[in-house]
UniProtKB/Swiss-Prot annotation:
Residues 537-841 form the Autotransporter domain. InterPro entries: Autotransporte_beta, Autotransporte_beta_dom_sf, Polymorphic_membr_middle, POMP_repeat. SMART domains: Autotransporter. Gene3D superfamilies: Autotransporter beta-domain. NCBIfam families: POMP_repeat (TIGR01376). GO terms for cellular component: cell outer membrane; extracellular region. Keywords: Cell outer membrane, Cell wall, Membrane, Secreted, Signal, Transmembrane, Transmembrane beta strand. It is a peripheral membrane protein. It comes from the Bacteria. Residues 1-24 form the signal peptide. Its main location: secreted. This is Probable outer membrane protein pmp2. Belongs to the PMP outer membrane protein family.
Length: 841
């Protein structure tokens, strides 16, 4: 049987671990038979004691659960697993199984679950799929001493899930008390929740702690609930060390407290006298959150500086993650107590790399502060940076632009005599995301007076470069200019905003709205062409026709213009009659259904009703020229050269259409990330007029395919308008009315071919647009009053048009006809297809 590589590697881990740890140590295998439940067991619980000087290894062959110890009516005064003072190392090798302690009420045992009296020896728990210490002991045990208590060192390594919850100690370390060094590393999930100590370290008390995340790491709701309590989550003993590395997951301190009822305050970590933080760092993409402050015991400064986001000596790993000190999770009452917002270190602090963020009115206090060019310090208004004994030197100070309107100030203080504050680069206005520039308050100019306050014991040095401000801009939203002005003594800085314009995002712009007028333009021209087509064919005195009509317009996309498509179709009915004077009068009505889309967020559905009136006057070219030349010598010179039989036509046409629009907008507004579909309705209309003339030239030579050549020239005018409207929905916008005007002078030739019962013609024309007003409207985003011009497409002003039509008689009283047209412009293409029948009256 083939063994998958993944399972082979997993099986090798405990094997390799044991080969390193077992040596001459005593080995005992643990299985499900070693589990115990005091509520169901008929025997008393028996603790395991290790005394082998070469050490003891517990090798797990199955999951083990020890719970409800002791049985009702009995007492438990010894740790479930005990390591004697003379014993060697104690190793628990999980082998991928789980190990659980729950409700272990060991009254006087130092470590209800695990206790080790062996100084300078190490207890290791590694390789478990789940490792849990729950209520071991619970706070109901008034003399409990935590879940794990070791006089040497302790390691929690390479476990999938570690949950340490609701444990209690009357001494130090509600869950863990380690006299030596505690190493917690590479655990995929680690949670210390609701543990409590009557003295120091609600969850952990130790001399030296190395905490390295292998996944999300959470310290929540731990407490030292006495007047003398220190370190809600972690307490470091005097002269101890603390190293925190967010290597493979976020680390969160939240809701950890100290103090008796009525004097409760927040505390994440307490550093004993002369204790120090040796490392505070997060890898790229990870963050360490201090929603509770760091406190110190005593006032003795530590010589070693804290280099934030700096690797160990000789390690090339880069730490570019984020360290956050925040008071955001405090209640309004808690935020009023400065202790809940103040983190204090008795070390010099150097920001070496990555980002340090101060939020929610916190105060970060240390001996002094310096900053390398590769790091960023981002401060909310209301936060403070306080140097107690040294100077402050900053190279990359950023102000969180989202906090500008909270009415507070950023404070930098180095008030000790002969100490300076130095800012070597421009202050930066930082934004968390580009949506900031969608805020409606940016619609007006603003000045934020004195939002940066500096207090130095000696000098405030603002370099020449720092007297300007760098703002992270967005290509979308409100556009404007940020400026910074320093007071004469450089103790205060004022930041100002001057609005310039508003640039919509692609989701907000909606160019389809003005482009709908191009759809009306195409439809009304096609309708007018159809009315002209209805007068063609057999020379009936009176005729009635009915047909289907369809149009397609495709506008290609450009760098600054979105592509769109218009498709319409419907029915046309019409009639024409020859009047007593020989003129032809035509009348038509149409109903069209259209669909427009911009290939992005908007789709429009439209319904158009249109009517058209056309009058054509036929005469000979000779009579027309005779009238135009009037009386005089020029008439006598030119008129003899004009054919008296060549037919000429003049015609005029007027059309009107009304359109009802219904637009669908699909958007993805955050939050929640769910697709939203909104519908909006409004109306519009279109007028179109046309004047033209043509001369039909008969091919009498008998040569060539076509029998008649008809050159023509037209003047076409189209005016389309749509009403203003307000769109309501996820993206609410107000669109002003918009219009399109276009004047074209098409000229071309019609080539005709006739048979006994059939008739064809082909038209080729060139149509320049000599005057045009492109569609546009003013759009206002109702959520922030941002306003901009939404411009429709600017179709190329020269068009080449080809049309082909065919007619076939069905006896003396009926006729079928069809037409295909294609229009090409440099930026668009349009097609129309018509087919119908005529009936003679």
């Amino acid at each position: 049987m083939k063994i998958p590589l993944r399972f082979l590697l997993i099986s090798l881990v405990p094997t390799l671990s044991m080969s390193n740890l077992l040596g001459a140590a005593t080995t005992e295998e643990l299985s499900a038979s070693n589990s115990f439940d005091g509520t169901t067991s008929t025997t008393s619980f028996s603790s395991k004691t290790s005394s082998a000087t070469d050490g003891t290894n517990y090798v797990f062959k199955d999951s083990v659960v020890i719970e409800n110890v002791p049985k009702t009516g009995e007492t438990q005064s010894t740790s479930c697993f005990k390591n004697d003072a003379a014993a060697g190392d104690l190793n628990f090798l999980g082998g991928g199984f789980s190990f659980t302690f729950s409700n272990i009420d060991a009254t006087t045992a130092s470590g209800a679950a695990i206790g080790s009296e062996a100084a300078n020896k190490t207890v290791t728990l590694s390789g478990f799929s789940a490792l849990s210490f729950l209520k071991s002991p619970a706070s109901t045990v008034t003399n409990g001493l935590g879940a794990i208590n070791v006089k040497g060192n302790l390691s929690l390594l390479d476990n999938d899930k570690v949950l340490i919850q609701d444990n209690f100690s009357t001494g130090d370390g509600g869950a863990i008390n380690c006299a030596g060094s505690l190493k917690i590393a590479n655990n995929k999930s680690l949670s210390f929740i609701g543990n409590s100590s009557s003295t120091r370290g609600g969850a952990i008390h130790t001399k030296n702690l190395t905490l390295s995340s292998g996944g999300e790491t959470l310290f929540q709701g731990n407490t030292a609930p006495t007047a003398a309590g220190k370190g809600g989550a972690i307490a470091i003993a005097d002269s101890g060390t603390l190293s925190i590395s967010g290597d493979s997951g976020d680390i969160i301190f939240e809701g950890n407290t100290i103090g008796a009822t009525g004097t409760v305050s927040h505390s994440a970590i307490d550093l004993g006298t002369s204790a120090k933080i040796t490392a505070l760092r997060a890898a790229q993409g990870h963050t360490i959150y201090f929603y509770d402050p760091i406190t110190v015991t005593g006032s003795t400064s530590v010589a070693d500086a804290l280099n934030i986001n700096s690797p160990d000596t000789g390690d090339n790993k880069e730490y570019t993650g984020t360290i956050v000190f925040s008071g955001e999770k405090l209640t309004e009452a808690e935020a009023k107590d400065e202790k809940n917002r103040t983190s204090k270190l008795l070390q010099n602090v150097a920001f070496k790399n990555g980002t340090v963020v101060l939020k929610g009115d916190v105060v970060l206090s240390a001996n002094g502060f310096s900053q390398d060019a590769n790091s960023k310090l981002i401060m909310d208004l209301g936060t403070s940076l306080v140097a107690n004994t040294e100077s402050i030197e900053l190279t990359n100070l950023e102000i969180n632009i989202d906090s500008l309107r909270n009415g507070k100030k950023i404070k930098l203080s180095a008030a000790t005599a002969q100490k300076d504050i130095r800012i070597d680069r421009p202050v930066v206005l930082a934004i968390s995301d580009e949506s900031f520039y969608q805020n409606g308050f940016l619609n007006e100019d603003h000045s934020y007076d004195g939002i940066l306050e500096l207090d130095a014991g000696k000098d405030i040095v603002i370099s020449a470069d720092s007297r300007s401000i760098d703002a992270v801009q967005s290509p979308y939203g409100y556009q404007g200019k940020w400026t910074i002005n320093w007071s004469t003594d450089d103790k205060k800085a004022t930041v100002s905003w001057a609005k310039q314009s508003f640039n919509p995002t692609a989701e907000q712009e909606a160019p389809l709205v003005p482009n709908l007028l191009w759809g009306s333009f195409i439809d009304v021209r096609s309708f007018q062409n159809f009315i002209e087509l209805g007068t063609e064919g057999a020379p009936y005195e009176k005729r009635f026709w009915v047909a289907g009509i369809s149009n397609v317009l495709h506008r290609s996309g450009r760098e600054n213009q979105r592509k769109f498509r218009h498709v319409s179709g419907g029915a046309v009915v019409g009639a024409s009659t020859r009047m007593p004077g020989g003129d032809t009068l035509s009348l038509g009505f149409a109903q069209l259904f259209a669909r427009d889309k911009d290939y992005f967020m908007n789709t429009n559905f439209a319904k158009t009703y249109a009517g058209s009136l056309r009058l054509q006057h036929d005469a000979s070219l000779y009579s027309v020229v005779s009238i135009l030349l009037g009386e005089g010598g020029l008439r006598e010179i030119l008129l003899p050269y004009v054919s008296k039989t060549l037919p000429c036509s003049f015609y005029g046409q007027l059309s009107y259409g009304h359109t009802d629009h219904r637009m669908k907008t699909e958007s993805l507004p955050p939050p929640p990330p769910t697709l939203s579909t909104d519908h909006t309705s409004w109306g519009g209309y279109v007028w179109a007029g046309e004047l033209g003339t043509r001369v039909a030239v008969e091919n009498t030579s008998g040569r060539g395919f076509f029998q008649e050549y008809t050159p023509f020239v037209k003047v076409q005018a189209v005016y389309a308008r749509q009403d203003s409207f307000v769109e309501l929905g996820a993206i609410s916008r107000d669109f002003s009315d918009s219009h399109l005007y276009n004047l074209a002078i098409p000229l071309g030739i019609k080539l005709e071919k006739r048979f006994a019962e059939q008739y064809y013609h082909v038209v080729a024309m060139y149509s320049p647009d000599v005057c045009r007003s492109n569609p546009k409207c003013t759009t206002t985003l109702l959520s922030n009053q941002g306003s901009w011009k939404t411009k429709g497409s600017n179709l190329a002003r020269q068009a080449g048009i080809v049309q082909a039509s065919g007619f076939r008689s069905l006896g003396a009283a009926a006729e079928l006809f069809g037409n295909f047209g294609f229009e090409w412009r440099g930026s668009s293409r349009s097609y129309n297809v018509d087919a119908g029948s005529k009936i003679k009256f």
